[in-house]
Structure formats: structure tokens, C-alpha cells
Curated annotation (Swiss-Prot):
This is Apolipoprotein E. It comes from the Eukaryota. It is found in: Secreted; Secreted, Extracellular space; Secreted, Extracellular space, Extracellular matrix; Extracellular vesicle. GO terms for cellular component: chylomicron; extracellular exosome; high-density lipoprotein particle; low-density lipoprotein particle; multivesicular body, internal vesicle; very-low-density lipoprotein particle. The lineage of its organism: Eukaryota, Metazoa, Chordata, Craniata, Vertebrata. Its main location: secreted. It comes from Dinomys branickii (Pacarana). Residues 152-162 are annotated as: LDL and other lipoprotein receptors binding. Homotetramer. May interact with ABCA1; functionally associated with ABCA1 in the biogenesis of HDLs. May interact with APP/A4 amyloid-beta peptide; the interaction is extremely stable in vitro but its physiological significance is unclear. May interact with MAPT. May interact with MAP2. In the cerebrospinal fluid, interacts with secreted SORL1. Interacts with PMEL; this allows the loading of PMEL luminal fragment on ILVs to induce fibril nucleation. The modification Methionine sulfoxide is found at M137.
Length: 300
């Protein structure tokens, strides 16, 4: 039954009017056609929406029933559980980062989670309202109600596309920020080391100008030993920073691959079930049409 109502949501999101389809194609990012695996799966999802639009408008009315609110509630709860699980994984990945960065990212994730819940709640309310109006008609024709619903859902599609693009931009900013932070750390160490070397050079020049040659040589040896010690510590610190950045990079890549695999595993079975449901439904409808068509009468 969940798959059946997923088909209902897909059909309504696809729109009931053919003239809204060019707008959808114009808004779809090109990266969904040749990007990461989860983006490719999302591209196949939108391709399937365009295919669903070619089906009969009567499919929507046949799928409506009194259980639509309950089924959508179950789907919403399952989706929010997945969002919370992914949020927990991100919090574990952010362990090596600064507290300020972790707090900012956690706040933005909570806001995105709230927007997602509000979007799904709006879809459920629109479908419930549409079902009630279809049953009572409220003085409107079915085409008028369908056009109103298509307008609301078209606005919702724009909002979802905007949120997806905003998420991609935020991920790019975080990636650039991490690289920039690592570069700043290395630059700061280099500047500090250069300052120590310059101070040592000035002190050596001052010592060599003293009349007592032995004292100058002693100070020079001590200074060189100090510089070598500082240089060794700086190199060790640089190596440690590089190792930490490499560990963070590997963890992020591993989590990203796992999430991409999860998205792929979620989308592809859903699409396969939807295709199977539609094939059975179309076959039943064709069989019903074939049996209900009266045989032509012969003229005497």
C-alpha cells in the first residue's frame, strides 16, 4: 500500500497539465544527468515523472481513498527517521572540527530538517484537501480542482529544487572552508618559522661583531642548536597537521560513499516497485477496457 501511495504522490507532483512540463525541464540541474551516483538516481526519478505525465488523468481518482492521510503519515515518519540517522552520522564526522563550526552546521541541519518536515506536511495537507474537494466538489468542476492542485504542487517543486541547490552550495562552501583552514594553519607555521630564522640571523650578526671571537662562536652554536630544535618541532607539527587532514578527508569520503550507496539503494528499489505497480495497473485497465467494449453488430 505504501508503494501505491508513493505512486499517487509521484503522479500529482508530475502535474496534470502538459504545459507545465517545460518549466520542470528548465529547472532541473544538468548535474543530475552526469554527476554523482545519487544525483544520477535523482535524474532517473525526474525522468520517470515525465513518463508518468503521459498516463491517463483518471489514475489519480482511482488511487484516492480514505487511507491517504495515514499512509502519508507513515512515509513522513520513515523519512524523518532517515534524516535524523544521517544527522547523527554527520555529527560524528565533525568531531575533529572546531566547536564553532560544529555548532553552525548543527543549526543549519536542524533548519533543513524543519523545512523538509514542513514540505512533507504541506503535501499531505494538499492531498487531503484535494480528496475532500473531489468528494464534495464544493461547486467546482474536477478540472478546476485539478488545476488548483497542479498550481500548488508546481510551486512546491520549485521550492524543493531551490532547497536542493542551496544544499549543494553549502556543501561546496564547507569543502572550500576546510581546505582554506588547513592552508591558513600551514601558512601560520611557515611565518612563525621564518620569523625565528630572521631573529637568529640578526643575533648571529650582532655576536660576530663583538670583539670576543670565542664568545661569539659559543652564542652562534647555541643559536643554531635552538633553530634546529625549533625547525624540527615545526616540521613535526606540519606532518601532524597533514596526517590529521588526511584522516579527516578519508573519513568524509568514506561517509559520502556510504550515503551515496544508501541513496542509490533507496531510489532504485522504489522505482522498480513503482514500475511494477504501474505495469500491473495498466494491464488490468487494458483488460477491463477490452472486456467492456461491446462487439459490433452486423447490418442485415
Amino acid at each position: 500500500m505504501k508503494v501505491l501511495w508513493a505512486v499517487l504522490v509521484v503522479t500529482l507532483l508530475a502535474g496534470c497539465q502538459a504545459d507545465v512540463e517545460p518549466e520542470l525541464e528548465a529547472q532541473e540541474p544538468a548535474v543530475w544527468q552526469n554527476g554523482q551516483p545519487w544525483e544520477l538516481a535523482l535524474g532517473r526519478f525526474w525522468d520517470y515523472l515525465r513518463w508518468v505525465q503521459t498516463l491517463s488523468d483518471q489514475v489519480q481518482e482511482e488511487l484516492l481513498s480514505s487511507q491517504v492521510t495515514q499512509e502519508l503519515t507513515v512515509l513522513m515518519e520513515d523519512t524523518m527517521k532517515e534524516v535524523k540517522a544521517y544527522k547523527s552520522e554527520l555529527e560524528q564526522e565533525l568531531a575533529p572540527m572546531a566547536e564553532e563550526t560544529k555548532a553552525r552546521l548543527s543549526k543549519e541541519l536542524k533548519a533543513a530538517q524543519a523545512r523538509l518536515g514542513a514540505d512533507m506536511e504541506e503535501v499531505r495537507n494538499r492531498l487531503s484537501q484535494y480528496r475532500g474537494e473531489v468528494q464534495s466538489m464544493l461547486g467546482h468542476s474536477a478540472e478546476e480542482l485539478r488545476a488548483r492542485l497542479a498550481t500548488h504542487l508546481r510551486k512546491l517543486r520549485k521550492r524543493l529544487l531551490r532547497d536542493a541547490e542551496d544544499l549543494q552550495k553549502r556543501l561546496a562552501v564547507y569543502k572550500a572552508g576546510a581546505s582554506e583552514g588547513a592552508e591558513r594553519s600551514v601558512s601560520a607555521i611557515r611565518e612563525r618559522l621564518g620569523s625565528l630564522v630572521e631573529q637568529g640571523r640578526l643575533r648571529t650578526a650582532a655576536l660576530t661583531s663583538q670583539p670576543l671571537q670565542e664568545r661569539a662562536q659559543a652564542w652562534g652554536e647555541r643559536l643554531r642548536g635552538r633553530l634546529e630544535e625549533v625547525g624540527s618541532k615545526a616540521r613535526d607539527r606540519l606532518d601532524e597537521v597533514r596526517e590529521q587532514m588526511e584522516e579527516v578527508r578519508l573519513k568524509v569520503e568514506e561517509q559520502a560513499e556510504a550515503f551515496q550507496a544508501r541513496l542509490k539503494g533507496w531510489f532504485e528499489p522504489m522505482m522498480e516497485d513503482i514500475r511494477r505497480q504501474w505495469a500491473d495497473l495498466i494491464e488490468k485497465m487494458q483488460a477491463a477496457v477490452g472486456t467492456s467494449t461491446p462487439a459490433p453488430t452486423q447490418k442485415p
